[in-house]
Amino acid sequence: MDIHLEDYLSAGYLITQFVDDASLNQWMRDVNHATEDLLPSRILSVGFCGASFAPIFKWVSPLVEDYARFGIPENRISELTSWANELFDKEIGHPNLFFRLRTAREYIRRFTNQSSDMQLLGIGLHQERLHQVHELEQGRPGYVSETGAKVTGFAGSGFAQALRLKESPERGEILGFDVVCLEANIDHSWHCNGLAVDAVGKFNFYPNQFGLIDNKSDADKMADYAEEIESEDGTWLPVLVTRYPLTP
């Protein structure tokens, strides 16, 4: 995979797990008329609604089970909450993005049991797509609700904040491209809409062993197609996905 990282900006780092994909393959057969399993048995995604992401902020109401899934004992949640609140908008963004790899690794070291099923992923956006992020920020500004609550626009999302640092993604194991839909944050991936069926039928490519897209050209086609058919409200973008060891 010929990727020039200097052409990309980091959109943050997150901690997730593999997603068991049997039900999604069956759904694509039942609803999207797929004639074969198009995805591997387990996938990785930075935006799939069925994926689990490591909980960071208590005010987004994670369950105790969410912490346990990532090996965080209940007696450490209070310390994690204080740490995360201190770093909010400085090193960590809403809802689950670390601006830098070192902060994600600090989270893993301090609060988790470093279980082998955790996956530390980085998100990269090609600079040619930055204008779409700017348009999204302009189209979804912050506002004050009728109750007086301050509602952050897209510019206040962790994704947008990380991009404004203008840092290249850290070097790691490049897994491929995800295609994600942005509205308030990263709200969906192309798998939320079964678009692997269109990848095969319209664009003649299959997802790779991670459920991602192997090359930028196909990822661009899929993002533009999802935008064209308006499969979700929001802006569709192809993002580079890189995997890192949990510890340096």
Model segments located where?
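Short aromatic-glycine-(Arg/Gly/Cys) micro-motifs in beta-strand/loop hairpins
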Residues: D2-H94, R109-H131, Q138-N208, E232-R243
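Extended amphipathic secondary-structure runs
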Residues: F98, A104, S116-M118
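Short amphipathic alpha-helices within nucleic acid-binding modules
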Residues: R100, A104-I108, N215-A223
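A short, highly charged, low-complexity intrinsically disordered segment
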Residues: Y206, I213-K216
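Acidic, proline/glycine-rich low-complexity IDRs
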Residues: D218-P248
